[in-house]
UniProtKB/Swiss-Prot annotation:
Its EC number is 2.1.1.174. Its main location: cytoplasm. This is Ribosomal RNA large subunit methyltransferase G. SUPFAM superfamilies: S-adenosyl-L-methionine-dependent methyltransferases (SSF53335). The keyword Cytoplasm applies. Specifically methylates the guanine in position 1835 (m2G1835) of 23S rRNA. InterPro entries: DNA_methylase_N6_adenine_CS (IPR002052), rRNA_m2G-MeTrfase_RlmG (IPR017237), RsmC/RlmG (IPR046977), SAM-dependent_MTases_sf (IPR029063), Small_mtfrase_dom (IPR007848). Belongs to the methyltransferase superfamily. RlmG family. Keywords: Cytoplasm, Methyltransferase, rRNA processing, S-adenosyl-L-methionine, Transferase. One of its GO terms (molecular function) is 23S rRNA (guanine(1835)-N(2))-methyltransferase activity. It is an enzyme of class 2 (transferase). It comes from Shigella flexneri serotype 5b (strain 8401). It comes from the Bacteria.
Length: 378
């Protein structure tokens, strides 16, 4: 846990999933402090919109203003709810919207934590363009190293005149005034052909490897299991290309597409609808934190390309949580397949959780591993 003192309230904040006590990662950063400083002793007219509030630092601090927390991460929503409870703040003080929803009209203040990808930032700025006014105070923040010329140009292009502040604690702010500059329409998704198939893959703004098949997924697809039955999971599904291939290779199976990103799940659904509509009755789509809340002993197999970062931080906490949830939800003799960078040494992590692990395939960068849920372990 970490403590954030600001002009609104003193907060105790924790990351979600929680990090270990040996190398704890902080649940807020200097950019959060810097943004809140801009609103000290300031009357806030109209709705407050907060975008990409990773662990709820801004939402908790501004809870008395009934803010809207907008983002593309269910884990961030869970983190914010947990930190509201931790600080004795009514959860209903914050209204949660995902990035595909319509934003509230005529906000008084918009606070943006600049996301990792320009594509998501552009989608969010275009959504804001429909609701902000020239009186809306628009402030964005990030580590100074993460604000580039391209970031500023995007604010200018979509919203209007943009300036930056001096760096403070290695953070920098962007101030923007809306003046409705001319702007061409843009498609909601990017599409590309998947080589070796007749499929066209559609990706919303925040989907990993948005403009083509990433090399880890490409390697994984060469070693996917075939002729499985029952329910199998594409965990952390992204655009659903793994799950789509599983539907094709396992005609007797149902595939459950799971991701914490609403845009990823929307992309997966769109890709099944457009490429294998006949398989929709064998498909389920779920926005979730790994397999939290899913009944145990449900699935015959789980397939996963786990992330090794959360927001801007390198961490295996999300992957570790995925592995534990996968084991709980697998049937006895159910199988977990993963692809990962070789240097992450997930072989020993899986062996610790499952009691076994087998290398299915390897190259100079990636490894495909399989672990089986055995009846003798609980």
């Amino acid at each position: 846990m970490s403590h954030l003192d600001n002009g609104f309230r003193s907060l105790t904040l924790q990351r979600f999933p929680a990090t270990d006590d040996v190398n704890p990662l902080q649940a807020w950063e200097a950019a959060d402090e810097y943004l809140l400083q801009q609103l000290d002793d300031t009357e806030i007219p109209g709705p407050v919109l907060i975008l990409n509030d990773a662990f709820g630092a801004l939402s908790c601090a501004l809870a008395e203003h009934k803010p809207y927390s907008i983002g593309d991460s269910y884990i961030s929503e869970l983190a914010t709810r947990e930190n509201l409870r931790l600080n004795g703040i009514d959860e209903s003080s914050v209204k949660f919207l995902d990035s595909t929803a319509d934003y509230p009209q005529q906000p008084g203040v918009v606070l943006i934590k600049v996301p990792k990808t320009l594509a998501l930032l552009e989608q969010q700025l275009r959504a804001l363009r429909k609701v902000v006014t020239s009186d809306t105070r628009i402030i964005a923040g990030a580590k100074a190293r993460d604000i580039h010329t391209s970031t500023l140009e995007l604010f200018e292009k979509v919203l209007g005149p943009t300036t930056t502040t001096l760096a403070w604690k290695k953070a920098r702010l962007i101030n923007c005034t809306f003046n409705e500059p001319p702007l061409a329409d843009a498609p909601q998704t990017v599409s590309w052909k998947l080589e070796g198939t007749d499929w066209t893959i559609h990706n919303h703004a925040n989907v990993f490897s948005r403009t083509g098949l990433d090399i880890g997924a490409r390697f994984f697809m060469q070693h996917l299991p075939e002729n499985l039955e029952g329910e199998i999971v594409d965990l952390g599904c992204g655009n659903g290309v793994i799950g789509l291939t599983l539907l094709d290779k396992n005609p007797q199976a149902k595939v459950v597409f799971v991701d914490e990103s609403p845009m990823a799940v929307a992309s997966s659904r769109l890709n099944v609808e457009t490429n294998m509509p006949e398989a929709l009755d064998r498909s389920e789509f779920m926005i979730n934190n790994a397999l939290s809340g899913v009944e145990p002993f449900r699935f015959n197999a789980v397939l996963c390309n786990p992330p090794f970062h959360q927001q801007h931080a390198l961490t295996d906490n999300v992957a570790w949580e995925m592995f534990h949830y996968a084991r709980r939800c697998l049937k006895i003799n159910g199988e977990l397949y993963i692809v990962a960078n070789r240097h992450l040494d997930y072989f020993h992590k899986l062996k610790k959780i499952f009691g076994n692990c087998t290398t299915i395939a390897t190259n100079n960068k990636f490894v495909v591993l399989k672990a089986v849920k055995l009846g003798r372990r609980r």
